[in-house]
Amino acid sequence: MTSRLSTVLLVCWWTLAACQDATPVQGPTETISTGRVLGKRLDVLGKSVDAFLGIPYGEAPIGELRFRSPVARQPWEGTYNATTHGYGCYQVPDESFPGFEGSEMWNPNVRLSEDCLNLNVWAPHPRPSNAAVLVWVYGGSYISGVDSLDVYDGKTLAAEEGVIVVSMNYRMGALGFLAMGDESAPGNQGLRDQALAFQWVQDNVAVFGGDPSQVTLFGESAGAASIALHMISPESMGLFKRAALESAGLSVPWGYYTVEEGTRRGMLLAAALNCDTDTGGSALSPSQVVDCLRRRDVVEILADQWVTTDYLDFPFVPALDGTFLTERPESAQQRGAVKDCELLIGSNTNEGTFFLIYEVPGFSKDSDSLLDRDGFGTALKYAFPRANSFGLSALDYQYTPWLRPNDPALLRDAVDQATGDYNFACPTYEMALSYARTGQSVYYYRFTDRASNNPWPAWMGVLHADEIAYLFGLPLHPEKGFNSQEAALSRRMMRYWANFARTGNPNGASGSDWPLYTVETQEFLTLNKSLVDGQITIGRGPFAQACAFWREYYPTLLTQTGDISEAERVWKQQFSDWSTKYMVNWKAEFDSYVNGKQCE
């Protein structure tokens, strides 16, 4: 008897769905469209919250469903045990800094499986009536992420603000974004997973006290980029009312590819797994390639899916498939062909540093990453691999700290600024401006607060994703190591986001801290601990100059210098060197002379 019980428990541990009836019904239960679910009641800072974790919203995308669009979950018999998180979707954990909290906090904390289409709901107890709903979409470069991370725990936001919080897992990497141009692997599987979860919210959130007509999507990085794509997709525009985007927008340069490029990358993956040709050496069709990939072990796919080599060029991303995405995101943005909704959007001070330490020469977590002029040029060349010599010279000129052009710390910070502007900050700025032009209500923020317990070195500043902990209320829990001011800032930010979800205005009914962002004023709110002391800092035109460079000058320069003759290229390069590098050297000599030193 003991042996048999042990076997049952072991099987349950490995596959929760197979044992959904094994747990006695103790705790809060609700009946949703697919059956009955059992949750657990939590005490959160003296308030009660019911958590329903790991609820399946899609069938397991395995076998013939691998690489296909998701299929809604069929009803089950009995009561589903939703007291623990479900499986996370397959990914490769970050092992760059073993044991280091700053990177380990983003690694999966649950078992991984292809059977990962599940979601979580946190609802206040007693149940509210027609409460606003906040649906979280995690980031992770479209290759990693899981909804069970401590930093994504929705219990505190639900408890403090009386809102319903939902989060979901979705497929990533090749499993989520392989695009081969036909129905066998149409592309955008991960985005369609998200949309299926949004539909689940529409169908079921009222059971938990939520209002399906008051759904706000919020997400960070690739999660925010995903939401931006839902804002232009004909397949998902009707599934939510508002959007809050952190550190990404429609024009992120890493956010999509054409089906042709997706197919090219898919064939590289196929070649690595011997799925590109038949036994006679003849090339396989895309559907035959996909059939072969379906028979490969998922671990093999994960091991070989990184088919790109450029910096911040993620291997499998959303595709312009003609159905979910019918035009280039930046074109839709320029035309104003976007969802009619209120928008909250912004970015952090140092968006680039987190990525620089992984790939760019001269940058390290374990040093101050100081750069000389040569190191500055090398870093720019690596961070912008598609720039020709004229583009690199323009970057050098635009981001050189001209007041002290040889200062190693300023040169380091300038590479962070260039990387952050291009990949994250300017896409948020451009989307805010575009939305404001359509007459929509837009609220822009700049998060500038470095937490007292931040494990990353001080030079890295306020990193990409640092704001997330504040939005989920982690600083309110003493064991997390934040101070009292950070806890107060977290309360303020949760209130802003919840007010936005309730009314479309982060200020709520009577506040006026956060000004409306308009084309004329371009005002934004600075989010840091000074807010706690009543010091409200309003900025204007956060990146107008820098983003004009990326929007207007830089792409035009690359286009116009892409096919010039060698003689003209050399002459222009020499002129560019004179206007940047040699001017820096001249200024250094002049400064030495002014300071009473002998020029050499």
Regions found by a protein language model. Give the residues of each.
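Serine-hydrolase-like catalytic core of hydrolytic proteins
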Residues: 4-6, 12, 100-287, 323-326, ...
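C-terminal, loop-rich substrate-recognition/catalytic regions characterized by aromatic stacking residues
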Residues: 338-390, 534-598
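Short, solvent-exposed turn/loop segments enriched in Gly/Ser/Thr/Pro and often Arg
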Residues: 171-174, 218-222, 445-454, 512-520, ...
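Non-catalytic accessory segments of hydrolases
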Residues: 13-191, 212, 312, 475, ...
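Bulky hydrophobic/aromatic "packing anchor" residues in well-ordered structure
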Residues: 57, 71, 76, 293, ...
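A structural signal for well-ordered alpha-helical segments within the folded catalytic domains
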Residues: 50, 114-117, 192-195, 199, ...
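Surface-exposed patches in mature extracellular/periplasmic domains of secreted proteins
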Residues: 213-215, 274-292, 304, 407, ...
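Substrate-gating cap/lid region and adjacent catalytic-acid/histidine neighborhood
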Residues: 251, 292-487, 496, 503, ...
